[in-house]
Amino acid sequence: MHTQIFDMKINVIMLKQDDPKKCSAAKLVKFGLANNIRKTSSRTLVLNPFSKKILLKSDKKLVNSITGIDCSWNHSTDTFSKSFSGISRKLPPLLAGNPVNYAKLNKLTTVEALSAALYILGDSETMTLFLAKFNWGHTFYTLNKNLLEDYSKAKSESEIHKICEEYGLSYSYL
């Protein structure tokens, strides 16, 4: 049984489409930092890169958990075309810090996505704990520190758009 040490439960659905040795979600489960689940609940925040809505700090009051769907980017369109119960949100633009997709916009691992969500929702301490489990975790934070801070202060999607403009980031996917 998982002990909840954070404000919210952290869940992952592992679809086992990638190299298991490189699976960031599996590592979180192994260290007891996330629950491996099969179905999402109605009160979970589902991180979905194709959602129509962007994650905002105010979303925290709507949910009691965060769920990352661990799948291959090669299968992501098909995976996220399926319906997951819960509140679906996408992250604003961020740069990957992982060695496979280093500095690519929005090609995040599950741990990067969960960490970014935690930071935006106001839990930078848990984000730091998660990223510390990976040799490259600090790289993700270094690349996105200012963005994450600004995103965590945004009160609306239009503010997210302004932040993206200030940083010269394309938000056409938004």
Regions found by a protein language model. Give the residues of each.
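Acidic, serine/threonine-rich low-complexity regulatory regions at protein termini
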Residues: 16, 40, 165-168
